[in-house]
Amino acid sequence: MEGLGGFLIPLILMFAIFYFLLIRPQQKRQKQIQEMHNNLQRGDKIVTIGGLHGTIDSLDESTVVILVNDNRKLTFDRSAIREVVNPD
């Protein structure tokens, strides 16, 4: 029986380390992204995952219309928004 316990403890320890170093931070980041997408508002300055900078003109449940240079309007999925940029 001692051999089984000697094998099981390192396995559990490796799983715990894997969870706290890889899985938990990813879940936390995903929650932050979802919260940011839910809090988008008209007038927010944003950056898309493709690097396009613009201002939100309008939005609905799944899409966002972004105003870019020369008042051009582009439509993106909400999931394409990488970050909201705070104007300084």
From Swiss-Prot:
The chain crosses the membrane at residues 3-23. InterPro entries: Preprotein_translocase_YajC. Part of the SecDF-YidC-YajC translocase complex. The SecDF-YidC-YajC translocase forms a supercomplex with SecYEG, called the holo-translocon (HTL). The lineage of its organism: Bacteria, Bacillati, Bacillota, Bacilli, Bacillales. The keyword Glycoprotein does not apply. It comes from Halalkalibacterium halodurans (strain ATCC BAA-125 / DSM 18197 / FERM 7344 / JCM 9153 / C-125) (Bacillus halodurans). It comes from the Bacteria. The SecYEG-SecDF-YajC-YidC holo-translocon (HTL) protein secretase/insertase is a supercomplex required for protein secretion, insertion of proteins into membranes, and assembly of membrane protein complexes. While the SecYEG complex is essential for assembly of a number of proteins and complexes, the SecDF-YajC-YidC subcomplex facilitates these functions. Its main location: membrane. GO terms for biological process: protein transport. The keyword Secreted does not apply. It is a single-pass membrane protein. This is Sec translocon accessory complex subunit YajC. One of its GO terms (cellular component) is plasma membrane. Belongs to the YajC family. Keywords: Cell membrane, Membrane, Protein transport, Translocation, Transmembrane, Transmembrane helix, Transport. It is found in: Cell membrane.
